[in-house]
């Protein structure tokens, strides 16, 4: 699996400025005011550090597997109209709270055929209307078998910064890190109809390690 976008995957690079800032503030307060005043700031710094953790994951070898693009909880498994490719599709949505790992990983092997970015609102990402009203970044990925998958990063109530490191024409491997959403969010995956679905509403999933569905 390529790690070219994340040279240090244990701590996501998107968090380095926040982590550095939190620790510098804690150090300065400790130097000038002592441990008592600095302790709450050290706790905040540790929380920021854990938020941006980005541990490596084991990639399943199951042929035809569609992997979870993020850690979190399943909030939707619906037959819908894919708004990006104008087709009937199965939508599986993963909601990330502030305690989940927020690195986003490719659900399938394939070439990025197109990409769309939409500014929008910052509604609670667990709400259904967040899929079409919130700020979002969508990737159209086509597998070597010609199957189309749409993976959509969606900003949430707290998350207001979507990061995507890939572009049309590039190839993604299953489980490859391609982006990050800071401070809570959601990822929607639109799949062709007729998939074997392996998850249900309320299930907790782990990015890359959980198989959301399988191509038949």
Curated annotation (Swiss-Prot):
It is an enzyme of class 4 (lyase). GO terms for cellular component: plasma membrane. InterPro entries: PS_Dcarbxylase, PSD-A. Is synthesized initially as an inactive proenzyme. Formation of the active enzyme involves a self-maturation process in which the active site pyruvoyl group is generated from an internal serine residue via an autocatalytic post-translational modification. Two non-identical subunits are generated from the proenzyme in this reaction, and the pyruvate is formed at the N-terminus of the alpha chain, which is derived from the carboxyl end of the proenzyme. GO terms for biological process: phosphatidylethanolamine biosynthetic process. Its EC number is 4.1.1.65. It catalyses: a 1,2-diacyl-sn-glycero-3-phospho-L-serine + H(+) = a 1,2-diacyl-sn-glycero-3-phosphoethanolamine + CO2. HAMAP family: PS_decarb_PSD_A (MF_00664). This is Phosphatidylserine decarboxylase proenzyme.
